[in-house]
């Protein structure tokens, strides 16, 4: 178990990278730290690894504080974006290396036996005699992960390990990472800025922005039940459609369409709607083409994404997107009528707090 309590990090230039972070991660759990550049996710990873010292707060592994422990004494495995393999060594020698130096040094024969065991688990046995320059990026990544695991760490820390790989290989390797860490049962923290990676690989996701945890939840809840406007806008591709509307009695009025509040589910309201203005969020898949439409508009561009299309249109100066079936054969400059599936509506106060 990893416990992070009131963790702050302020750099010498006064920048507060982390603002009193509180997190608890369970043993054997795969947790992604997700967010835009500069949000603090890598800072947390470096603090967990002992590569940075916190300004205040505490970090505990299994109820024992590690704040004052050297990185080598924290029993962690760390894999960076750059694989950091020794170019003059073979794969077997690279994997064995952590077992032949420092306080974990053991006889060469024993180190080789352990290395081969983990190389079998990660399916890199056939690469044993190759050097890094003779391998693909995906193969090098497997070697780097194996080298981290061979030390039998309690915690595995992965810092954007897939960012140097092409899209198809990223998909393959992330599946392998998920399988591997679950097979071994190791607690894993995975840093990424890619929401698709986080959604597909995680047990839970920590979504961060400006040094603050915005939501710590299971993947589907970040998409379906965002806590605030930032989460709703960050999660989802295409991005959620946003409209500013005015409340008049039980109607939210917009330029091209209105939202009847009486049609919303009462148990989804998180507070009473007492303000005059609200931000309405509608996921693209909930803008549906319909003859009995709320509004009609001209399609500006169409993006083909396999069996679906992303159609882009303008709602009185606000650009919006809908996902439609490619067989609808919608083309640029077509006049198309849209309705709204109320299951895909979210309401936010102007400060970003979600109220529905």
List each model region and its residues.
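Helix-to-loop junction immediately C-terminal to a conserved catalytic motif
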Residues: 49
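ABC ATPase nucleotide-binding domains
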Residues: 74-77, 81, 85-230
């Amino acid at each position: 178990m990893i416990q992070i309590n009131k963790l702050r990090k302020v750099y010498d230039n006064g920048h507060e990278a982390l603002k009193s972070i509180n997190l608890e991660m369970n043993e054997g759990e795969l947790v992604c730290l997700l967010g835009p550049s500069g949000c603090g996710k890598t800072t947390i990873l470096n603090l967990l690894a002992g590569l940075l010292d916190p300004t205040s707060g505490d970090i505990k592994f299994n109820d024992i504080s590690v704040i004052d422990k050297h990185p080598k004494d924290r029993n962690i495995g760390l894999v960076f974006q750059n694989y950091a393999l020794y170019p003059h060594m073979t794969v077997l020698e690279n994997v064995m290396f952590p077992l032949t130096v420092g306080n974990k040094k053991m006889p060469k024969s024993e180190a080789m036996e352990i290395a081969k065991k983990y190389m079998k688990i990660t399916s890199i046995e056939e690469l044993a005699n190759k050097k890094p320059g003779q391998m693909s990026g995906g193969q090098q990544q497997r070697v780097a992960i194996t080298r981290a695991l061979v030390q039998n760490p309690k915690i595995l820390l992965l810092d954007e390990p897939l960012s140097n790989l092409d899209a198809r290989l990223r998909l393959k390797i992330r599946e392998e990472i998920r399988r591997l860490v679950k097979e071994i049962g190791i607690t894993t923290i995975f840093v990424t800025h890619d929401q698709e990676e986080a959604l597909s690989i995680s047990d839970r996701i920590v979504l961060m922005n400006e040094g603050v945890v915005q939501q710590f939840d299971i993947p589907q809840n970040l998409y379906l039940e965002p806590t605030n406007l930032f989460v709703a806008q960050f999660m989802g591709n295409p991005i959620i459609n946003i409209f500013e509307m005015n409340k008049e009695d039980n109607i939210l009025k917009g330029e091209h369409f209105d939202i009847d509040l009486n049609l919303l589910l009462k148990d989804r309201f998180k507070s009473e709607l007492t303000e005059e203005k609200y931000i309405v969020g509608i996921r693209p898949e909930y803008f549906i083409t319909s003859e009995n439409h709320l509004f009609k508009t001209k399609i500006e561009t169409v993006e083909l994404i396999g069996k679906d299309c992303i159609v882009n249109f303008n709602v009185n100066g606000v650009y919006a997107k809908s996902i439609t079936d490619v067989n609808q054969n919608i083309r640029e400059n077509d006049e198309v009528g849209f309705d709204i599936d109320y299951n895909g509506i979210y309401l936010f106060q102007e400060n970003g707090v979600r109220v529905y």
